[in-house]
């Protein structure tokens, strides 16, 4: 945990206007050079039962600059020590939220399905947390569930009680005012890593981009051997 590290990550709600890199200007001089922490390679070590090992070796830093020209992005990138740079033109991909480019393999890569073809993303995630003594920090979560906010997937959580639970919840019980466009609504709330179980009595209402309403609850965090990374859930269409 490091106070102030939240300043170097994108807005965790998924609000596209809250990226760390400023909006790309048509005026070249207004586009800054950014130092990019490349994070880690995907971990390959086998973790202890109930633990995770998602991060491998650190990948170091690069410097990047993004320009725009004729509706395309011009990505300039280089190692920190070099005085020259590589440059590639990246076109927007119709029907997709993003076009992804790997600075390691130096090519466009497929990461997500088409924008309207998915609702939930099971992933590692960088959240922003409040520190006990004040200030904020960036923090990495495993077993995180994000919603597709750019396709306006909405959700809210419900704590079951004696009168309302997952089994008897119906379309008439949906509170449309409670539906939110924030990719953290499910987040890490659905599971308890200390007990290796799902959060009891919690279920979710989800509305997809077509207006379909579902109820969903998680049934497992680990597999039969106690290994994380095997979430299970059930869901039902309400309308």
Q: Where on the chain are the PLM-derived regions?
A:
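Surface-exposed, beta-sheet-biased, low-hydrophobicity segments with strongly acidic/polar composition
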Residues: 1-239
């Amino acid at each position: 945990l490091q106070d102030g590290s939240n300043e170097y990550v994108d807005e965790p709600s998924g609000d596209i206007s809250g990226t760390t890199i400023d909006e790309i200007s048509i005026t070249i001089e207004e586009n800054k050079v950014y130092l990019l922490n490349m994070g880690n390679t995907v971990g390959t070590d086998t973790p202890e039962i109930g633990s995770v090992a998602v991060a491998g070796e650190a990948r170091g830093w690069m410097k990047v600059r993004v320009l725009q020209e004729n509706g395309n992005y011009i990505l300039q990138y280089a190692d920190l020590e070099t005085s020259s740079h590589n440059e590639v033109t990246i076109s927007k991909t119709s029907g997709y939220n993003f076009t992804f480019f790997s600075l390691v393999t130096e090519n466009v890569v497929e990461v997500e399905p088409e924008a309207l073809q998915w609702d939930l993303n099971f992933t590692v995630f960088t959240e922003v947390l409040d520190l006990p003594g004040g200030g904020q920090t960036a923090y990495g979560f495993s077993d995180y569930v994000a919603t597709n906010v750019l396709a306006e997937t909405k959700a809210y959580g419900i704590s079951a009680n004696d009168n309302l639970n997952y089994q008897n919840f119906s379309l008439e019980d949906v509170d449309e005012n409670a539906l939110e466009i924030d990719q953290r609504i499910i987040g890490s709330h659905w599971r308890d890593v200390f007990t290796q179980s799902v959060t009891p009595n919690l279920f979710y209402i989800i509305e997809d981009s077509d207006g379909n309403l579902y109820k969903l609850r998680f049934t497992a965090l680990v597999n039969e051997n106690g290994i994380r990374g095997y979430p299970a859930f059930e869901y039902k269409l309400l309308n």
